[in-house]
Amino acid sequence: MNEQSPALRNFTINFGPQHPAAHGVLRLVLELDGEVVERVDPHIGLLHRGTEKLIETKTYLQAMPYFDRLDYVAPMNQEHAFCLAAERLLGIEVPRRGQLIRVLYSEIGRLLSHLLNVTTQAMDVGALTPPLWGFEEREKLMVFYERASGSRMHANYFRIGGVHQDLPPKLVDDIDAFCDPFLKVVDDLDQLLTGNRIFKQRNVDIGVVTLKQAWEWGFSGVMVRGSGAAWDLRKSQPYDVYAEMEFDIPIGKNGDCYDRYLIRMEEMRQSVRIMKQCIAKLRAPDGQGPVLITDNKIAPPRRGEMKRSMEALIHHFKLYTEGVHVPAGEIYAAVEAPKGEFGVYLVADGTNKPYKCKIRAPGFAHLQAMDFLCRGHLLADVSAILGSLDIVFGEVDR
């Protein structure tokens, strides 16, 4: 309410869900004083599918595809968290080649996510060329997904104890051949946006988050690194073969939209660095071997064995009808997903289905801060701030 006259009221508008900058099904109710944002009220739940409840009625193997449908921009990163949780409860070690393939595909997922975010963030502030370049590269990466798993998006490729099948040698060569030309595309995007006067005016000093605020709001990933903390689960709590990988963690110093953009650009370069190391290790003698654990109580036996051995046939039948029995216990497993810390809190009761599977989506904590981030900014800045948060509604609404 304005001080001077009771007749002057704030103006309320709906931003989305049909808005092009609303990234899916976001609905923001904005309260404006002129063109200055006074209050932002995000309305969520338009993509709610009851994932956590559905997982309780499915076996551990059947629950896997639900994770692809959370952050559907980088699907395999979520499967990773669920697999890690179940593996820790089972107390099993994934074969080295399986770990390498997982890390390789997690980094491909990071590229998929950052490419989409950086280019659509640019589109939200008016640059129309980057999305066209970004989608061309994403297309190539999705073909790599398809060649590994048979599906472009909802891969369902990771398994408890490794991955579903080995990569063909030609695919490893093609991923290797993709890396260097891709860095050139990142440089082209860099040239187009980083020094661009309009892009900087729209992003510098917009949506500033101090490090203290980032911790208080429960931020993770790029949102924390943009404010100056070198916090990355791949370094601080390494999983699979990340401990062997050499890469740097880019951090910002201003905590604004521009810093977050720069970090995502640098993270793409670091991801390519990790991918190259994975490919070298996959080709090395110690990178050969099985991609899935050989325990037939957890992973299916090979087709050839099933034709010869009755035991293998029984194992196969039991595994796909009844599923894996995970020992009772509870565990929290988190991975450094492209959007932040994606965690799975898994409670097992000794049966073939999870008792409870709580999903900690990074985008949820970031979206709830929209009000605090946008207050005092102009209406046009709302889409710039939203673009830098990197929100996907599959994981927010679950």
From Swiss-Prot:
InterPro entries reported for this sequence:
NADH_Q_OxRdtase_suD (IPR001135), NADH_UbQ_OxRdtase_49kDa_CS (IPR014029), NDH1_su_D/H (IPR022885), NiFe-Hase_large (IPR029014)
Which keywords has UniProt assigned to this entry?
Cell inner membrane, Cell membrane, Membrane, NAD, Quinone, Translocase, Transport, Ubiquinone
User: What is the recorded name of this protein?
Assistant: NADH-quinone oxidoreductase subunit D
The UniProt catalytic activity note for this protein reads: a quinone + NADH + 5 H(+)(in) = a quinol + NAD(+) + 4 H(+)(out)
Quote the EC number.
7.1.1.-
Provide the assembly information.
NDH-1 is composed of 14 different subunits. Subunits NuoB, C, D, E, F, and G constitute the peripheral sector of the complex.
* Function (record text): NDH-1 shuttles electrons from NADH, via FMN and iron-sulfur (Fe-S) centers, to quinones in the respiratory chain. The immediate electron acceptor for the enzyme in this species is believed to be ubiquinone. Couples the redox reaction to proton translocation (for every two electrons transferred, four hydrogen ions are translocated across the cytoplasmic membrane), and thus conserves the redox energy in a proton gradient.
The gene name reads: nuoD
Family as reported in the entry's similarity comment: Belongs to the complex I 49 kDa subunit family.
Q: Does the keyword NAD apply?
A: yes
On whether Transport is a keyword of this UniProt record, the answer is yes
Q: Name one Pfam family in it.
A: Complex1_49kDa
| Annotated localization | Cell inner membrane
**Membrane-protein topology:** Peripheral membrane protein
GO CC, one annotated term: plasma membrane
